Swiss-Prot record:
Keywords: Aminopeptidase, Glycoprotein, Hydrolase, Membrane, Protease, Serine protease, Signal-anchor, Transmembrane, Transmembrane helix, Vacuole. Its EC number is 3.4.14.5. This is Probable dipeptidyl-aminopeptidase B. The chain crosses the membrane at residues 94-114. Residues 40-49, 124-133 have a biased composition (Polar residues). Residues 1-93 are cytoplasmic. Residues 27-39 have a biased composition (Low complexity). It comes from Arthroderma gypseum (strain ATCC MYA-4604 / CBS 118893) (Microsporum gypseum).
Length: 917
C-alpha cells in the first residue's frame, strides 16, 4: 500500500513498504534530494529553521503543562446571557464572591490533586531491569537547554539531510564510472556525461561528453524546456519529455521529443502525432528504436525513419499494453513500466493487462477536478467523480499475460509455458531480460504462496518452468514482489561457463542470496547464510571480478552495512572502515567499479564517492557532510534515543524510546507510542531522522516509544510470517505488552499513554485500542486507517490474509468491529481524506456506522475534503500534524477525561438562575 510521500513522513509509509525509508501508498524519500545528476524530478532543499524557531513561539507554549493535568474549574461565564442583560449590583456581588470562592476551591483541589495523584508521585527507584533501554543510547550533540523544534520546521524539511542522487550511466563501449549530470545554474552545458573522478568538472577528461548545450530547444519555433531526459545507450540521442501530467503514484503522461546530440536539434517522437500524450517510452539497448505506449497501445519508432508502427491496436479503457494498471503499479511493479527490451534489442516483452471484469470504485471530488474537465451545463454543483478500476479482496483481479514482439520480423507472439499458473490465479511480479533472447519470468498465485520461475526463449518461442516453490509448505508465509533478480551472463574466460541468475530465497528461516546456474538448475549455490537477512539485494555486480555487493543486517536487524561476496560463495567481507553500529546505503556504477556510499545514521548523514573494493584504482571524494544539519543539531534540543528490545511470547522485539531533553527520572512522563507495523516493514532503525515523533519529545516534552512487533521485517521469517491470515492480532498484542512494560517504569505515568499511526499504522492504532479496551492505552490517533481488509486492494490483502472466500473468520477477526471495546478507551481521534484512492474513505465511514449503532461517542473525527492518502489538499498535511499535536496535548492535560461524561454542575445552574433574575 502506498501514499504520496513527503519529507520526513515515515508515519505515513505505504502498506507495501518493506522498510521505513524505502517508499510511500505514502511515497518515500525522507531526505531532501540535491541532484548533481539527472534523476526523474530533481530537487534541492536548503530549508532553514522558521523564524518561530528563533523567537521561541513554540518553545514555551506548553511549558507549564508538561507533566500534570490541569484541574477543570466550573466557573466559566455562561455564554447564554443575553447581550442586553443588566443584573443588579447585589446579584453581581453574589456572583463575584461565588466566583472567588470557586477559584480558591479550585486551586485547593488542584494542589491536592497534584500532590496525591499517582501520576505525580516521585520515584527514586532507577530502572535497572533487563529491559532497560540504556543498553544502546544515542545522545545528540546539542545541549539540553537548546531551542525546541518548531513543528513547521519539521514539516517544511529544514531537518531533512541533503542528499545527492547519482545517475550512473554506462559508456557507449561499456565504460564504467560515468555519471549523467545536469547543470541547473546556467553555467556550463545543460546535460553532460562526466567521469566520476571529475564530478566537479575541474579537470580535462576525454570521457566527458556534452549531450545538450542549453536547457531549451526549439521545434518549429516552439520553445521546449525538457522536464525529464533519457540518453540513448550510445549517447547520440536524448529522449526528452515536456508537459508532464501526473496520473497515479508513479505514472504520468507527457509530450516526447528526440534530441540529436551532434546537430543539437530535435523532432517529435511521433511526427504524425506530436501532441499525443505518451504514457511511457523506453530505449532499445542498441539505440536505434524507442518503444512507447500511448492511449494504452504499444508502438515502436525506428530512428532511421519518421514512421511509427503500432504493435497493438485494441488497447483502451480495459486493455493496457506495456504499462501497468492501478493495482499493478501500486502493489507489484511500484513503477509505471511493463515493457522490457531484450539485451540484444531484438525482442520486446510487454504485459497485456485486461481489466474488463475488475469492479470500479468511485472517488468523489467536491472542490477540485482535472484541468481539462468541464461539467455539463446545469451540473456545476455536482462533485467530479473519478471511477477507478480497483480490485478489492475477493473481487476479480485484472488478468495479465506476457507477450513478445519480434523487432526484425515486425510481429507479435505469445509463448505457452507448460505448468504455468492459470490466468485468473496469476500475478506476474518480475520480468528479467537475459542474453540471446532469453527472458526470466517470476509469477505467483493470487494468494502469493506459490512462486514459479519460467525461462522463455524468444528466439525459439518456447518456455518452461525451471523453479517452483510452495512457501506455505516452507514456513507458512508469502512471496513479496521484488525487482532485484539479476541475470548473470556466461563468460568462460571469467569462470562462468553458463548463464545464471541471482535471486533472494528463503534459507534456514532467513532471506539470503542464491546463485542459480546453469539457468535451468533449481538448486542454487548459496552466497549468504546465517541468522540475518539481505536487503533488496544485490546492489551491484562486478562481472569482471565475479564479485557481488549487497546490503544486509548481519551486525543487527536495525543496522545496515555493505558487504561483498565472491560468486562462488567465498570471501564474504564487510566494507572496510564501516562503523559497527550504523545505517548505510549504497549505489554502484554500471560495472560496480565505483560507488556512492551513504551513511544515514545514527549520527549526521554523509555521502562519499569511492572506488569499490574490487577496483584497485583508489579514489575517494566526500560529496556531502550536511554541515547545515550538524549546525542545527547543536542549536536545538533533540531527544536522546534509547534502543533496546523486549521479549513477548519468546520473540525479541526491537524498541526505540525517545526521551525529552532534560529528562528527569524522578518525574512522571506521558508516553506516546508511534507505529506502522505492516508486514515486512521496519520503523525501529539507526537512521538519523527528525520527524513528528522528534517534535513531540523535544517540544511537547513527552516520551515517544516505537516497537516493531511481530509481522515486521528483518528479524527472520518466523517473526514475520506469524501474522499470516490474522492481521492485527499479534501486532496489537505486542504493542499492549510493551506499553504495560513501559507503564511499570518509574518515570512513566501509566495513566497517560497514547498510540498513533497512519495508513497501516492507523489500522494498528484502532486494533490496539480495540484489543486493549482501555486497560493500558487511554488515547489513540488513527490517520487514514484500514478498518476492514475486505475494502482494501486484492493483491496486497490476499498476500497476507488469503482471499475472503478462503479465510472468512480471519477477515472478520481482523476488522475493527468491537465498538464496545473502543468505548472503554478515554478518547480517540480519526482523520481521513475524502478522496483517498488507496485506503478508501469507506473504511472510516463503515467504522463510524458501527460506533453509531452501539451509541459510542468517545471519539473525534476530522475529514479532509479532496485529500488523497497523503492528505495534502489545501494545506491539509500541516493541519493533520497540528491537529495531532493539539489533540495529544489536550489528552495528556486531561481535557478528554473531563469530556468523557459531561454534566452541568449545580454551581453553573445557580449562577445561571442568579444572572437571569
Amino acid at each position: 500500500m502506498t501514499v504520496g510521500r513527503r519529507l520526513n513522513d515515515e508515519e505515513a509509509i505505504p502498506l507495501t513498504a518493506k522498510e521505513a525509508g524505502s517508499r510511500d501508498s505514502i511515497d518515500s524519500s525522507s531526505t531532501a534530494s540535491v541532484s548533481l545528476t539527472l534523476v526523474d524530478g530533481t530537487n534541492h532543499t536548503t530549508a532553514k529553521p522558521s523564524k518561530s524557531a528563533h523567537k521561541g513561539v513554540s518553545r514555551d507554549r506548553y511549558a507549564d503543562e508538561k507533566y500534570r493535568d490541569d484541574v477543570e474549574e466550573d466557573w466559566e461565564e455562561d455564554r447564554y446571557i443575553p447581550s442586553n442583560a443588566k443584573p443588579s449590583q447585589r446579584r453581581t456581588q453574589i456572583v463575584f464572591w461565588l466566583l472567588v470562592a470557586l477559584c480558591v476551591g479550585g486551586w485547593a483541589v488542584a494542589f491536592l490533586f497534584f500532590v496525591t495523584s499517582p501520576g505525580n508521585t516521585i520515584s527514586t527507584t532507577p530502572d535497572t531491569g533487563s529491559g532497560s533501554p540504556d543498553s544502546d543510547v544515542i545522545k545528540p550533540g546539542s545541549p539540553p537547554a537548546g531551542k525546541k523544534i518548531p513543528l513547521d520546521d519539521v514539516l517544511g524539511g529544514a531537518w531533512s539531510p541533503t542528499q545527492h542522487t547519482i545517475s550512473w550511466i554506462a559508456g557507449p563501449k561499456g565504460e564504467d564510472g560515468l555519471l549523467l549530470q545536469k547543470s541547473e545554474g546556467g553555467t556550463g552545458p545543460y546535460l553532460h556525461v562526466e567521469d566520476v573522478r571529475n564530478i566537479h568538472g575541474t579537470q580535462s577528461n576525454n570521457k566527458s561528453m556534452v549531450l545538450m548545450k542549453d536547457s531549451v530547444f526549439f521545434v518549429n519555433d516552439e520553445r521546449i524546456s525538457p522536464e525529464k531526459v533519457w540518453p540513448s545507450p550510445d549517447l547520440k540521442t536524448v529522449l526528452a519529455m515536456t508537459r508532464q501530467k501526473k496520473n497515479w503514484r508513479h505514472s504520468y503522461t507527457g509530450l516526447y521529443w528526440l534530441f540529436d546530440v551532434e546537430t543539437q536539434t530535435a523532432q517529435p517522437l511521433d511526427p504524425g502525432a506530436p501532441n499525443g500524450r505518451i504514457q511511457l517510452a523506453t530505449w532499445s539497448p542498441t539505440s536505434d528504436a524507442v518503444a512507447f505506449t500511448r492511449d494504452n497501445n504499444l508502438y515502436i519508432r525506428n530512428l532511421t525513419s519518421k514512421t511509427v508502427k503500432a504493435i497493438t491496436t485494441d488497447g483502451g479503457a480495459n486493455l493496457f499494453y506495456g504499462i501497468p494498471d492501478w493495482v499493478y503499479e501500486e502493489e507489484v511493479f511500484e513503477g509505471n513500466s511493463a515493457t522490457w527490451w531484450s539485451l540484444d534489442g531484438k525482442y520486446i516483452s510487454f504485459l497485456r493487462t485486461n481489466e474488463t471484469t475488475v469492479p470500479e470504485f468511485p472517488v468523489d471530488f467536491y472542490l477540485s477536478s482535472p484541468p481539462d474537465y468541464a461539467p455539463k451545463p446545469g451540473e456545476e454543483a455536482y462533485p467530479y467523480v473519478q471511477q477507478i478500476k480497483y480490485p478489492k479482496a475477493g473481487a476479480p483481479n485484472p488478468t495479465v499475460g506476457l507477450q513478445f514482439y519480434d523487432v526484425e520480423r515486425e510481429e507479435s507472439f505469445s509463448v505457452d509455458v507448460k505448468d504455468s499458473l492459470n490466468d485468473d490465479d496469476r500475478i506476474i511480479i518480475e520480468v528479467i531480460p537475459g542474453s540471446n533472447g532469453r527472458i526470466l519470468v517470476r509469477e505467483t498465485n493470487r494468494e502469493s504462496y506459490i512462486v514459479k520461475v519460467a525461462a522463455i526463449d524468444a528466439t525459439k518461442r518456447e518456455g518452461k518452468i525451471i523453479r517452483s516453490d510452495n512457501i506455505d509448505e516452507i514456513d507458512g508465509g508469502w512471496v513479496e514482489p521484488s525487482h532485484t533478480t539479476t541475470y548473470i551472463p556466461s563468460d568462460p574466460a571469467s569462470g562462468r561457463p553458463n548463464d545464471g541468475y541471482i535471486d533472494t530465497v528463503i534459507h534456514e528461516g532467513y532471506n539470503h542470496l542464491a546463485y542459480f546456474t546453469p539457468l535451468e538448475n533449481p538448486k542454487p549455490k548459496m552466497l549468504t547464510t546465517g541468522k540475518w537477512e539481505v536487503v533488496a539485494a544485490p546492489s551491484g555486480v562486478d562481472l569482471k571480478n565475479n564479485v557481488i555487493y549487497f546490503v544486509a543486517t548481519k551486525e543487527s536487524p536495525i543496522d545496515r552495512h555493505v558487504y561483498s561476496v565472491k560468486l562462488d560463495g567465498s570471501e564474504l567481507q564487510l566494507l572496510k572502515d564501516s562503523e559497527k553500529s550504523a545505517y548505510y546505503d549504497v549505489s554502484f556504477s554500471h560495472g560496480a567499479g565505483y560507488m556512492l556510499l551513504q551513511y544515514q545514521g545514527p549520527k549526521i548523514p554523509w555521502q562519499k564517492l569511492m572506488n569499490s573494493p574490487s577496483n584497485t584504482d583508489s579514489y575517494t571524494e566526500i560529496l556531502e557532510e550536511n554541515k547545515r544539519l550538524a549546525k542545527l543539531s547543536n542549536e536545538f534540543a533533540l531527544p536522546s534515543l534509547h534502543y533496546s528490545s523486549i521479549t513477548v511470547d519468546g520473540f525479541k522485539l526491537p524498541v526505540v524510546e525517545r526521551r525529552p531533553p532534560n529528562f528527569d527520572e524522578t518525574k512522571k512522563y506521558p508516553v506516546l507510542f508511534h507505529l506502522y507495523g505492516g508486514p515486512g516493514s521496519q520503523t525501529v532503525n539507526k537512521k538519523f531522522l527528525v520527524n513528528f515523533q522528534t517534535y513531540v519529545a523535544s517540544t511537547l516534552g513527552y516520551i515517544v516509544v516505537t516497537v516493531d512487533g511481530r509481522g515486521t521485517g528483518f528479524n527472520g521469517r518466523k517473526f514475520r510470517c506469524i501474522v499470516r491470515r490474522n492481521l492485527g492480532h499479534y501486532e496489537a498484542y505486542d504493542q499492549i505488552q510493551t506499553a504495560k512494560a513501559w507503564g511499570r517504569k518509574p518515570y512513566v505515568d501509566k495513566t497517560r499513554i497514547a498510540i498513533w499511526g497512519w495508513s497501516y499504522g492507523g489500522f494498528m492504532t484502532l486494533k490496539t485500542l480495540e484489543q486493549d479496551a482501555g486497560e493500558t492505552f487511554q488515547y489513540g490517533m488513527a490517520v487514514a486507517p484500514v478498518t476492514d481488509w475486505r475494502y482494501y486492494d486484492s493483491i496486497y490483502t490476499e498476500r497476507y490474509m488469503h482471499m475472503p472466500q478462503n479465510n472468512e473468520e480471519g477477515y472478520e477477526t481482523a476488522s475493527v468491529s468491537n465498538s464496545t471495546a473502543l468505548s472503554q478507551n478515554t478518547r480517540f481521534l480519526i482523520m481521513h481524506g475524502s478522496a483517498d484512492d488507496n485506503v478508501h474513505f469507506q473504511n472510516t465511514l463503515t467504522l463510524l456506522d458501527k460506533l453509531d449503532i452501539m451509541g459510542v461517542h468517545n471519539y473525534d473525527m476530522h475529514v479532509f475534503p479532496d485529500s488523497n492518502h497523503g492528505i495534502y489538499f489545501h494545506h491539509a498535511y500541516k493541519m493533520v500534524h497540528q491537529r495531532l499535536s493539539d489533540w495529544l496535548v489536550n489528552a495528556f492535560n486531561g481535557e478528554w477525561v473531563r469530556l468523557r461524561d459531561p454534566k452541568p454542575t449545580i454551581i453553573k445552574r445557580v449562577i445561571r438562575r442568579l444572572l437571569h433574575r
